[in-house]
Each structure stands twice: as C-alpha cells, then as structure tokens.
Amino acid sequence: MPNKTVLHSKHLESGAKMVDFHGWEMPINYGSQIEEHHAVRRTAGMFDVSHMTIVDVVGEQAQDYLRHLLANDVAKLKERGKALYSGMLNEEGGVVDDLIVYHFETTNYRLVVNSATRQKDMDWLNAQAEGFDVTITERPEFAMIAVQGPQAKEKAATLFSSAQNEAVAGMKPFFGVQAEDLFIATTGYTGEAGYEIMVPNEQAADFWQKLLDAGVAPCGLGARDTLRLEAGMNLYGQDMDETISPLAANMGWTITWEPAERNFVGRKALEAQKAAGTDKLVGLVLTEKGVLRHGQAVQVEGGEGIITSGTFSPTLGHSIAMARVPASVGDTAQVEMRKKWVTVNVVKPSFVRNGKSVL
C-alpha cells in the first residue's frame, strides 16, 4: 500500500489525478498542469509537500556535527531562523541528498530532506552522528504546505493570527520562524515568493481548505516540476545523485571551502575533482518545435553530454532543459531528438525568476 499524506482526501475532493511518487500517492495535477503552473507564476498556488522528511538535530555538538556532515557551513548561520541549502556528500564526493537546514541555536537545527531518499538519509544521518553529542529526531507529526506565487504571502496572511503575521513581517528569503503552532519559512521550489508552512497534522486539512477558500489554486507534482526546472532548481535523482559531484551539478556555490581545516565528509574527493576539472550543468533552450527530455544525448564542443531534466516551459512557450556536458561547451549544442540532431542554445541553468524570463 502506498503512503498517503494527511491531505489525501482533500486532493480527491478537488479532483486530483493521483500517481505513485516514490511510494507516496500524490497528485500529479487537478485537471490542468499548465493552468496550475500559470497560477503560481501569476497569482498563487499551493502544493502538498507533506511527504518531505523533517528532521530535528539537537544537542551540545549539533553545530559541530552539521559542519562535519554538510558541504555548506552552518557556522555561517548567525541569525535565529536563517536557513541554507546544502549537499550532503559521501566520501567519494557524490551527493547523498540535497537539503535545507534551519538554524535556531548552535544546539538546535531543523533539516528538510527529500522523501524519495528518506530511509537512506536517516541511516546516513545516524551513521555520521557516531561520536557526536546529538539527538536526531524525525518529525512526522507535521504536514507541510508550500504556498507560492506573487500573491501567495498576502493570501496566506488572511489565515495567520495577528501574532503569526507579526512574526513573518519583513522576513527575508530563506528564513523560518515558529509562530504559535505553525513553522513558517520563506523558502520554495518555484522561483516565486511564498512560504513553506509546517502545520500539525490534525490542523492540515482545515488549513488547506482555508487556502482554497482564499483563492489559492491546488497544484500537483507536474506543475511543481515545470516550475522548479524554469527556476533552475535541481531534482535529486535526475540532476544529481550519489555518483555525481556537486561541482558537476551547478552546486559549487553550496560548498564552503574555508576554513581549510573543516574536514567535511567528501572534502578530499571534492578537492581532487576540482583540481582535475569536472563536467558542468548548463541550461538548454530549444526555440523551435519539440520537447527536450531527460536522457537525450547532447553533443558539444569537446565531447558528449546528457539531458538531466527537460520539459516544455509554459512561461516561455518553448522547451528548456538542464544538461551535464563537458566544461568546454560553447554557446550552442546539438541534441538528438527522434533520430536527428537539433541545435539548441546553451545558457546558465536558470530560465525564469519571479514570473519573468532571465534569458
């Protein structure tokens, strides 16, 4: 039997088409993936992300443990509630998972990791904790709802108490705050402003319904994928995995090299990869008809690569992709589509931000 989130019945009420997503029965769409995509870019949409794994790391050595575990450095987090994005690497420098970590105190952090990798991640977190004074606790009692889009914050504000609205007033991107019974974070996976809100399970259905009543469109995994790809955000298992270096996945910015004595997991392998050079993750744009797809072969100056994620972009009106290719790539590449080679433009792997093209 697949897992179901506490919002499962709400999805069915809204006419969702349900699919198996790594063991979870989740909505792929509620009738029109394109309309859901546009709702997030133009007004406000919401996603059930309760399948994501929430983990609290608490203890005297919580900061030391996370500085060992992650390629990014939690010591940079000085303000309460500030968050960062990081890869969690293996000794070979591959990506075990990507995650967000919220800092409350040097003895108290919260991680949000992917659902598809839950058991692997929990095993890895616990194995790496050996020798550290930390307690690692999964928090399945919370549902999580992402409200995203240019009107997302104002619509969510109509559900918040005055104390909750005060708590989030002026909150910058990549922060989280516990406001009464909600944990509200200015994070997301769409390239739009909005919140990711952790709600006690027993309140989640009512909260979802109130968002619906406020005019927030329910959105499925289909729109979530086209939105994140337009925003140039990686999908674990496609754009990177345990065999791929973050340096070859446009995640170099998430590696904190200084101080040199911080010997995080995978550092030695990364240093060797950096010295030798790696492939790079780039964006591809196809302006003629056709759709770029995961797994298609790419030819560039200096060698061959592969499309890691590809789709039709509803915002741009043509196809876009991310591809891992030799670092010698130029401004154009050839993609094999239906047994012929088609020319595409090579760009930075980010296409849309705040509803506007960045090409």
Curated annotation (Swiss-Prot):
GO terms of biological process kind: glycine decarboxylation via glycine cleavage system
Catalytic reaction(s) noted: N(6)-[(R)-S(8)-aminomethyldihydrolipoyl]-L-lysyl-[protein] + (6S)-5,6,7,8-tetrahydrofolate = N(6)-[(R)-dihydrolipoyl]-L-lysyl-[protein] + (6R)-5,10-methylene-5,6,7,8-tetrahydrofolate + NH4(+)
Listed Pfam families: GCV_T, GCV_T_C
InterPro entries: GCS_T (IPR006223), GCS_T_bac (IPR022903), GCST_C (IPR013977), GCV_T_N (IPR006222), GcvT/YgfZ/DmdA (IPR028896), GcvT/YgfZ_C (IPR029043), TrmE/GcvT_dom1 (IPR027266)
Function: The glycine cleavage system catalyzes the degradation of glycine.
HAMAP family the UniProt entry points to: GcvT
Family named by the database record: Belongs to the GcvT family.
Name recorded for this polypeptide: Aminomethyltransferase
Organism in which the protein naturally occurs: Pseudoalteromonas atlantica (strain T6c / ATCC BAA-1087)
